[in-house]
């Protein structure tokens, strides 16, 4: 048997998994613009994807074609910068958040990165309402990083927006492991499990769960 997958002496399976995630995070470096956006996110208490999650977003965006991207949950622009890094030069990021201050800081982050206003569309409001106004099958990638309670609604709308071959990406899909705990049955866990069920049972989608951040559930549409 190949020994490369064997646990190191004295290392349990959970600690090995944690070490792998830590290594993945440490392997990604962020430039000064991302670091500044992340610092502003911390200052205002806005969530921000980890560097490894950001790198994965950039990769998936590039693989999807990266011309039209929709984001639910702008934050201070950290994830937006990562998404834009994988987009084509003429691609447009549509990002939605209910918090005006988050949108202001994201706009600042994009401007500091030299991203022209024609490349981004920042929309304030409840995502459930805004998403219904976006056109069917018009997006290469939809990234959901908002209140887990509303994940099922966002997944339904997000899949509708995807063109064939497009990718939906859901952050906080494992809630740091709580979603996989049979004893956990709070409202967030129930909602996240329902979102995962919707994706798993949609025959148009091919999904995979990636153990980065609070869990990344990604699926490509046939």
Curated annotation (Swiss-Prot):
Substrate binds at residue 145. Its EC number is 2.1.1.-. The keyword Methyltransferase applies. The keyword S-adenosyl-L-methionine applies. Signal peptide: none annotated. Keywords: Methyltransferase, S-adenosyl-L-methionine, Transferase. GO terms for biological process: methylation. It comes from Mycobacterium avium (strain 104). Pfam families: Methyltransf_3. One of its GO terms (molecular function) is S-adenosylmethionine-dependent methyltransferase activity. Belongs to the class I-like SAM-binding methyltransferase superfamily. Cation-dependent O-methyltransferase family. S-adenosyl-L-methionine binds at residues 49, 71, 73-74, 79, 97-98, 147. This is Putative O-methyltransferase MAV_1364.
């Amino acid at each position: 048997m190949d020994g490369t997958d064997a646990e190191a002496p004295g290392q349990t399976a959970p600690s090995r998994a944690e070490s792998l995630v830590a290594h993945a995070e440490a392997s990604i470096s962020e430039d000064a613009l991302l670091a500044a956006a992340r610092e502003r996110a911390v200052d205002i208490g806005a969530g921000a994807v980890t560097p490894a999650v950001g790198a994965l977003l950039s990769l998936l965006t590039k693989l999807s074609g990266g011309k039209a991207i929709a984001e639910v949950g702008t934050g201070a622009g950290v994830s937006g910068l990562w998404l834009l890094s994988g987009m084509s030069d003429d691609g447009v990021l549509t990002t939605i958040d209910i918090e005006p201050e988050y949108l202001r800081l994201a706009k600042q982050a994009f401007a500091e990165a030299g991203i022209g206003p024609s490349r981004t569309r920042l929309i304030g409001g409840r995502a459930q309402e805004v998403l219904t106004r976006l056109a069917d099958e018009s997006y290469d990638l939809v990234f959901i990083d908002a209140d887990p309670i509303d994940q099922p609604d966002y997944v339904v709308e997000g899949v509708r927006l995807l063109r064939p071959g497009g990718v939906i990406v859901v952050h906080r899909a494992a809630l740091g492991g709580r979603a996989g705990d049979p004893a956990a049955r709070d409202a967030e866990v129930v909602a996240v499990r329902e979102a995962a069920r919707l994706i798993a049972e949609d025959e148009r989608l091919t999904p995979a769960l990636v153990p980065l951040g609070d869990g990344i559930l990604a699926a490509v549409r046939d």
